[in-house]
């Protein structure tokens, strides 16, 4: 179920404070956050946010196309190494 429009997008308060502070000062230093559940809002455009994926921080540069998505969608938590390949057996005649 989608979030109600009247509630607005969810952004953690501590993250929003850091974003507004970075926008005021024009600071381009990445913002480090563990808040994967926060929605990307237009105020974040042009900033780099380091999102924690459980092991390390993944840098995410925010563009207009990212608005409306969650930060966690751009920092995958699982590494897919592929399915086990079948071994071709040689058939001798």
From Swiss-Prot:
Keywords: Ribonucleoprotein, Ribosomal protein, RNA-binding, rRNA-binding. GO terms for biological process: ribosomal small subunit assembly; translation. One of its GO terms (molecular function) is rRNA binding. Transmembrane segments: none annotated. Protein S19 forms a complex with S13 that binds strongly to the 16S ribosomal RNA. Belongs to the universal ribosomal protein uS19 family. This is Small ribosomal subunit protein uS19. It comes from Nitratiruptor sp. (strain SB155-2). The gene is rpsS.
